């Protein structure tokens, strides 16, 4: 085992990376309220794992979507548990995100030189809410359908660009298969990719600048 480690150490300098991570200074004022961001990230990982598991059975079709969700809940081994964890962690992710934003704001973590960290965090908050909006409609039940119809209709109030934006979101004049396909694509590919890139950027800036000091 030692030879295997030495082989990787010689090429990747694993120990130097581990020492750099473990030796990072943590200010003494940091307390449990500074854990909200880490909890959001943990919830995101749970979402990815449980969401990926459900893609094996979910069908993004207006005809089969509800039946496939019902199948996951009633027939797939532990399917009810996986979907329930997905829902619970989604709620937890949003709640922890809100608390994290409040904590950063109240402790002045958005001030110079951390403005860009704050900006990426705000964009991540928008992405998180978008996860909820797109995922809410995927079962394509009555609640999901009308929620989708209302959400995609909101931009119509924006002058000039509003109506074309509605067409892009819905994939046509009315809510239907094209809308569900767009929401599914956004929920399972576009938003996770955007969140991963933004989180990496967010973490690298925190790593570079450190945790803000006490007020």
Curated annotation (Swiss-Prot):
Membrane-spanning segments: 32-52, 90-110, 116-136, 186-206
Keyword Hydrolase in annotation: no
Protein name: Cytochrome b6
Family to which the UniProt record says this protein belongs: Belongs to the cytochrome b family. PetB subfamily.
Binding site for heme c: 35
UniProt-annotated location(s): Plastid, Chloroplast thylakoid membrane
SUPFAM superfamilies: Transmembrane di-heme cytochromes
The record's free-text note on cofactor binding: Binds 2 heme b groups non-covalently with two histidine residues as axial ligands. Binds one heme group covalently by a single cysteine link with no axial amino acid ligand. This heme was named heme ci.
CDD domains for the chain: Cytochrome_b_N
Miscellaneous notes: Heme 1 (or BH or b566) is high-potential and absorbs at about 566 nm, and heme 2 (or BL or b562) is low-potential and absorbs at about 562 nm.
């Amino acid at each position: 085992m030692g030879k295997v480690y030495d082989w990787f150490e010689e090429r990747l300098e694993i120990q130097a990376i581990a020492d750099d991570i473990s030796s990072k200074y943590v200010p003494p004022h940091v307390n449990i309220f500074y854990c909200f961001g880490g909890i959001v990230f943990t919830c995101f990982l749970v979402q990815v794992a449980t969401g990926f598991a459900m893609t094996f059975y979910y069908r993004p079709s207006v005809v089969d979507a509800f039946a496939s969700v019902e199948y996951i809940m009633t027939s797939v081994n532990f399917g009810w548990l996986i979907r329930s964890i997905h829902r619970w962690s989604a709620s937890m992710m949003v709640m922890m995100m809100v608390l994290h934003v409040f904590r950063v704001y109240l402790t002045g973590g958005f001030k110079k030189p951390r403005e860009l960290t704050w900006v990426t965090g705000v964009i991540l908050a928008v992405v998180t809410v978008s996860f909820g909006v797109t995922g809410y409609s995927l079962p394509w039940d009555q609640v999901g359908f009308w929620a989708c119809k209302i959400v995609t209709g909101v931009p119509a109030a924006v002058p000039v660009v509003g109506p074309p934006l509605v067409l892009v979101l819905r994939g046509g004049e009315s809510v239907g298969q094209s809308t569900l396909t767009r929401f599914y694509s956004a929920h399972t590919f576009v938003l996770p990719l955007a969140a991963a890139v933004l989180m990496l950027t967010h973490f690298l800036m925190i790593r570079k600048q450190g945790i803000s000091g006490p007020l």
